[in-house]
A protein has these predicted regions:
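An aromatic- and glycine-enriched ligand-binding surface/loop that stacks and positions planar moieties
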Residues: 1-170
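Generic hydrophobic/packing signal
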Residues: 2, 6-10, 239-246, 289
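Active-site-proximal structural scaffolding
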Residues: 3-6, 58, 132, 225-227, ...
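Polar/charged alpha-helical tracts
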Residues: 4, 8, 12-15, 118, ...
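Generic alpha-helical secondary structure signal
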Residues: 4, 8, 137, 246-249, ...
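Sec-exported extracytoplasmic/periplasmic mature domains
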Residues: 11-19, 237-244, 252-256, 269-273
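Long, intrinsically disordered, low-complexity segments
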Residues: 30-99, 194, 201-228, 249-252, ...
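C-terminal substrate/ligand-recognition segments
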Residues: 126-253
Length: 366
């Protein structure tokens, strides 16, 4: 496939597919569904109320390609539920439902680097805006900043990263690591209060669709799309390949950012902020870095050197040398050992993935 052919396909999608940008990017994500605030209990998520947000639903006009999910999962077939949001949601260890409403729980793998937040703020401060805006609204669209309450000393705040008054607080886990005061919230489990049962449900979908399933575990009832390609990504891909600013500025306009001319640096920034936490950043870094991978390694290493919370204690982050590790692996994943065994000696493991690379524990993380 040639570059010209790819551009032609992108232009066909832009002009003829019927896909488009939704009015407000926040309305793509499940946290803006109205079910969370449709109860008589007084439980409210203030952020979408303050910003007048209304979820556009799954399979929206901006979604080009996505995994679909539903309420038919059980403990034999778990994959009908959105497990990615389970991985990226806060721990349940010390969660207070009223304090953290409407967010449900997960396995705690969605913390955001404070260095990334600082870089985003710094970039946003140097932009020009329209419609009276003075900051990039995608920052609070994309993450849930919170005051981190101490699990061992009620009322004590360990770190306060709150950026929007409409976001709820959170009592951090007494045993989880790398809790930073920020969670991404594009893929986060969102629950809702159910008036009928007078209880909190681990997914808003259980309240909106009563009786569809008897399952109640957060692991089995997450129904939001896992989006792989959005129309915004298509516009940015087209800008990059044609070295034109039309796609960039169409994406920026939605977030009340003034137009810019095309440059690779402008393109890189738009992709970073518009598509934050959507699983495209890693491969963007690798392809822009080229064979040396030096720029990717530097960017990864820059995301260290801040305080975080491990086991309920504020501590400096381990300064792991991501650049050195990237150089060892060249960005490749390991070949599964089963496949190497089946191949009977015809396959060699990728560089950087021998036995010495195996993770031992956090205390021996170098």
């Amino acid at each position: 496939t040639t570059k010209a052919e790819v551009v032609k396909h992108l232009e066909d999608c832009i002009n003829n597919s019927g896909h488009d940008l939704v009015k407000d990017q926040r309305e793509i994500w499940g946290y803006t569904n109205t079910t969370v605030n449709s109860n008589n209990s007084g439980y409210r998520y203030q952020y979408p109320i303050d910003h007048d947000l209304h979820w556009v639903g799954n399979s929206c006009v901006e979604t080009v390609f996505a995994n679909k999910h539903n309420l038919t999962s059980n403990w034999t077939y778990t994959w009908f539920s959105n497990t990615w949001s389970m991985f990226c949601s806060p721990s349940n260890d010390n969660r207070d439902i009223k304090q953290s409403y409407p967010f449900s729980f997960g396995w705690g793998a969605g913390p955001v680097s404070p260095k990334m937040v600082d870089e985003w703020k710094d970039w946003a401060a140097r932009q020009s805006y329209t419609d009276g805006y003075t900051e990039d609204p995608r920052l609070t669209r994309s993450m849930r900043p919170y005051p981190a309450y101490d699990p061992n000393n009620k009322g004590n705040v360990l770190l306060d990263r709150k950026l929007d008054k409409g976001e709820p607080d959170y009592s951090v886990s007494y045993r989880y690591y790398e809790q930073t005061g920020y969670f991404q919230k594009k893929y986060i489990n969102v629950g809702a209060w159910d008036d009928e049962s007078n209880s909190f449900k681990n997914s808003w979908a259980l309240v909106e669709n009563p009786g569809v399933t008897a399952q109640t575990s957060a692991q089995l009832v997450q129904t939001t799309d896992l989006i792989h390609i959005r129309f915004a990504d298509v516009l940015l891909m087209h800008s990059e390949l044609t070295e034109t600013a039309d796609g960039i500025n169409r994406v920026r306009e939605r977030s009340h950012l003034a137009p810019v001319s095309y440059s690779l640096e402008n393109l890189k920034n738009e992709r970073r902020w518009e598509l934050a936490f959507e699983s495209v950043r890693w491969f963007d870094l690798l392809r822009w870095a080229g064979p040396s991978l030096e720029s990717a390694g530097k960017i990864l290493n820059d995301q260290t050197g801040f305080d975080l919370i491990n086991e309920g204690i504020v501590t400096p982050m381990v300064r792991y040398d991501y650049a050195a590790r990237l150089k060892q692996t060249q960005g490749y994943w390991p070949i599964p050992q089963d496949e190497i065994d089946i191949a009977g000696g015809t396959l060699e493991q990728n560089p950087g993935w021998d036995a010495s690379a195996a993770f031992v524990d956090w205390n021996n993380f170098k």
